[in-house]
Amino acid sequence: MAYEASLIEKKWQKIWDENEYFEPKDDLNLPKKYILSMFPYPSGRIHMGHVRNYTIGDALARYYRKIGFNVLHPIGFDSFGMPAENAAIKHKIHPKSWTYENIAYMKKELFSLGFSFSKKRMLATSDPLYTKFEQEIFIKMFEKGLIYTKEANVNWCEQDQTVLANEQVEDGKCWRCGHEVVQKKMPGYYVKITAYAEKLLKDLEGLRDKWPNQVLTMQENWIGKSEGLAFSLNLDEKSKQKAKESSLEVFTTRADTIYGVSYVALAPEHKIVQNLLLQNLLNQDVLNKIKAIQNQSPRERQSSEKEGYFLGIYAIHPLSGEKIPLWVANFVLSDYGSGAVMAVPAHDERDFEFAKKYNLAIKQVIQTQENLPYTQKLGKLIHSQEFDNLDCNEARLKIISQFEAKNIGKRVVNFKIRDWGVSRQRYWGAPIPMIKCQSCGIAPQKLENLPITLPEDVQITGEGNPLDKHPTWKNCICPKCGKEAQKESDTLDTFFESSWYFARFASDEKTWQEKALDEKSVKYWMSVDQYIGGIEHAILHLLYARFFQKALRDLGYLTQNEPFDRLLTQGMVLKDGAKMSKSKGNVVDPDEIIEKYGADTARLFMLFAAPPAKELEWNDDAVEGAYRFICKLYDRAQNIKKGELVELKQENLNKEEKYARLKVYEALKKSEEVYHQSFAFNTLIAACMEALNALALCKNEALEQEAFYIILNILEPIIPHVCFELSEELFKCKNFKKLELKEEVFVKDTLNLAVSINGKKRAEFKISSSASKEEILAFAKENTAKWLEGKSIVKEIYVEGKLVNLVIK
């Protein structure tokens, strides 16, 4: 009987669905595993990146179910976002219709691959019920002071007509549409992620060896903790008159280099720069260039060529009394430190590059034979008055102490991470649950009025905010004074939705109507035991999710400190050496692969072609190879004896049979290591192939039966449909269970022993593993007879299973 993938897969998907095989059990006393792959945006079709991600997660979920764990393996859709509005403009379809039509199609695709997702806990973040509790969380954060409003320069995408977080600007362009991003001053809501900066940094330590080092490093750098000295610099008298300021605050992490300062660099937004602009004390050329710098995103400023302009004013060095020129520079950010940086060109690469470009003084204050800039924090100070000959660290501490004693400076800790702006000027997002009242200012909506839903009668044109233009939707009553007011017309950044969905999944779905999170089930299921997704989310979703977990804990919603215990970042799926994309014409449609070869073939290829963390190059021949392997497995199963397993006696097997059985059990042993630690599914599949090849040389009916029983068990998480089919056909099994290793299989028939005389190796021999110590010693003497001739043995040493040492004289 030929292998018919479509019939087998549809049969088992129906059985699994009807019997709710993949729903988590209600018994919260069972050992649990929460396996979660990052949920998709409903773009309309799944792609091969999705197939790889979800196949990895599904293999783990199926394995842990099989060995007795209560498994939560949910899926949902990150369904708000700009693409729905873009589709509305392009195809003249409502964003909601476009989104939910896509969700329906993608559900069908996902389940056609046999993924063992919980259907009862499936959600879309655009569902009103999800929005209701997201708005509740927003209000609780606002009341706790974790969300606030301010007017600030924001990253503005002209194409999408919306604000972007710093993390969403890539090389000066919008991460979503690729359009140039400009700076624009706007009011908005901000999440106070900086309040958790220290905790976010410190708690990375608990994730070491469980998260990829690259992700940990990226988060450390993004949080960017620096400890240093904040101090005042007085302006000289003439400069005070021009700048309308008497001093400025400066921050440095290198107080030991204080005597090497040759200029101070200010951010364009610094108050002194703005005062000079207001008084028209800077020429038009400088004015234009300052505006150009202000229009750059923070990331652009720090990555572009260093540029600056002398402001014509000076500060006084607080220790030496020397005059220091003040410059405006593009690499200084207004919201880091004080927006002013003391520049030490001799000991900082950026400052050195700037000083060389503008011919500024370079003052060496650390002794070194190396070329400047010398940036290491090692060496003795020079040209630093009473601090000469001190090493850098000692000098740094003493200089800070002197500043504190003179009351002109203090030790401070700064972080690079900025508060997260979450206001977006778009329609298809969760409405921000706030109102604007002329009498009361801004105020949160009453919880009983949630969810604040979107109006459906809108015109999506791509110009401006549709909610702002709606004739009636904004009108409301102020919850404080009862007067007429207006709803906030901005919607939330979609990363807000994906920052807590994992906790919603962990809540018993029977409680979803009543509460955001069910304490009992969340306490049981969280944290996620294994999270799987792309490394591109390292400082976006993963950082926000970690913040949300801590904030929700402090708000009393849950108890765990971190959302994800272990993280696997899978590599991209490439074709012709490039990421699959329609523009490159190198897309492979999963539906076509499933139709031609079946879901199991697609799954097998995804896990066999490369280790999960590495990039995977699509290969049509390798897909064919995966299909042939399944066909061969199916064909060979037709010759296996059906019925109950016959017990095998290891001692009754011949050499070839023992070897084949050993290979089968080695694969079973490897499965434990692969599923629990390495995720090297490719090596596990290879081990199964090796076992089947060894088995082909044997004609032992009982051995073949046992081997197939074990190999189907090993491969079930990877190619579940065909394994369930063959297991039912051969063994009347409709489910899989944990298998135990048989230690006697691993016992070697022969021992390879070395013989040493007076510690020097003289011979090697093979002997039966069942031989006694006396037999082994006799055989050792026989093999070394020529060295023993005329000698007497004074001591015989046998190290079991390894060597014999004879001491002679």
From Swiss-Prot:
PROSITE patterns, sorted: AA_TRNA_LIGASE_I
Primary location recorded for the protein, binned into one broad class: cytoplasm
Entry keyword set: Aminoacyl-tRNA synthetase, ATP-binding, Cytoplasm, Ligase, Nucleotide-binding, Protein biosynthesis
Keyword match Transcription regulation: no
Gene3D superfamilies found in the cross-reference section: 3.10.20.590, HUPs, Isoleucyl-tRNA Synthetase, Domain 1
The family this protein is said to belong to: Belongs to the class-I aminoacyl-tRNA synthetase family.
Name the UniProt record assigns to this protein: Leucine--tRNA ligase
Organism this protein belongs to: Campylobacter jejuni subsp. doylei (strain ATCC BAA-1458 / RM4099 / 269.97)
Gene: leuS
